[in-house]
Amino acid sequence: EMVELYEKYNDRVEAMFFETLADKRNGRNKSVYGGDVLCSSCHSAEHEIWSNSRHGRAYNTLRKINKAFDPECLVCHVVGFNLPGGFISELDTPNLKNVQCEVCHGPGRNHALAPQPGFGSKATEACIKCHVKNHSPRFNYTEYWPMIKH
C-alpha cells in the first residue's frame, strides 16, 4: 500500500514538472547563468577539481533513483532550479546540470563577460542551503571542504 502511494506521488510530481516546462522555456534565453564550461575558460584548475568531485556528478544521483524531475531534489542538484534562467530540464538546459560553480558562487554570465576580482559568494553560506540534517546528516564543513577545495 505504501509503495502504491509513493508511486502515485512520484507520478504526480513528474506530471507537475512537465506541466511547468513551457513557461520556463520562455525565459531561458535571458539566463544569468553561464554553466561550468563558461567558468572553466578562466578557471580550469578549479573546474578540474569540480569535475572529479561528487558535486560534478550530483544530477546522476537523481537519475539513479528516478528523481530527476522532483523539485525538492533538483533545487540542490542543479544550477538555479525554479529561478529565472536556471535549470529547466536535462533536455533544455544540460549545461546547468549538477552542483556547479554558480550554485556556490552565484550567477556568473555577467562576470564571465566582464571579469572583476572578488566575484562570488562565500561557499560556507551556500553549503548550508543544501547540506541539511535530513539530506546530509554527516555534513561537517571542516571535513567536507578539503574534498572540493579550490
Per-segment meaning from a language model:
Residues C127-H131:
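Hydrophobic, small-residue-rich alpha-helical packing segments that form membrane-like cores
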Residues M2-K122, F139-H150:
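Sequence context of c-type cytochrome heme-c attachment sites
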